[in-house]
Amino acid sequence: MSIETKTEQDVLLQGTGWEPPAPPTDLIFDDGEPLETNRHRIAMNVLIDSALTALAQRSDFFAGGNMFVYYSRVQAMNRDFRGPDFFVALDVDGSRDHKGWVTWEEEGRYPNVIVELMSSSTAHVDKGVKKALYERTFHTADYYIYDPFDPQSLEGWHLDAKQQYQPLAANERGWLWCESLGLWLGTWSGTIRREPSTGVYQWLRFYDRQKNLVLLPEEVAELEQQRAEAAQQWAEQEHQRAEAAQARAERLAAHLKALGEDPNTI
């Protein structure tokens, strides 16, 4: 196309008042489909709450889960729903409420980190279609998959300079590094929110650079309570020691007086 032809078309378009179609506004944010199991639901909330704790010093991020990500007009019109189980978007307005993640309302920003909580019925999609979408369209820097029912299932990829996913190598504990967040992602054995009722599960958790577990709000509260109880116990012991010392001093003074000595002169 010549410069002259392009200019003529621009003039014609301006003359007709043509404007590019506006993004759709009748977006659906809930398809009524719950997460696979209660364990999947708790696993998602654990990741969200852990991210909120780990990034508490920042305000320019959003952590969410099980919500739709809208990235194109065609996708929205086709009702081609894509909802990561967990994601974090950085360098965004973290004060806004979100029913979903609409990229054209977020200055074109996509999630920086995504975790899909797999099951036997979704593994092929999480490793195939979704992985390709997050790599080629979202350009999500760090992508992970994990089946809460399979402790050995954790895998992850990081986007290289060519915008292609490269598999992440696990450390000696089987954890994977998340460059975007500056955190480790690995399993933790225990009970969370009364799940399971007996025994333990292998939950996917965040760890800091020093490999310390990022605590959940209830774990922080429990730790603070334990510290408060320990401080109270120490204070009571100190009070008892002081009372015992005072009692010994009084007995000694009485004994000295009985011997005709003035305890104040000794």
Describe each PLM feature range:
Residues 2-36, 53, 71-84, 89-113, ...:
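C-terminal interaction segment
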Residues 41-54, 62:
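A structured, charge-rich N-terminal accessory region that forms the first stable segment of a protein
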Residues 45, 49, 65, 82-88:
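N-terminal, well-ordered alpha-helical segments
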Residues 57-72:
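A short acidic/basic microdomain associated with nuclease active sites
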Residues 62-64, 144-147:
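A structural signal for short, well-ordered beta-strand segments and their strand-loop junctions
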Residues 141:
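Short acidic/polar active-site loop segments enriched in Thr and Asp
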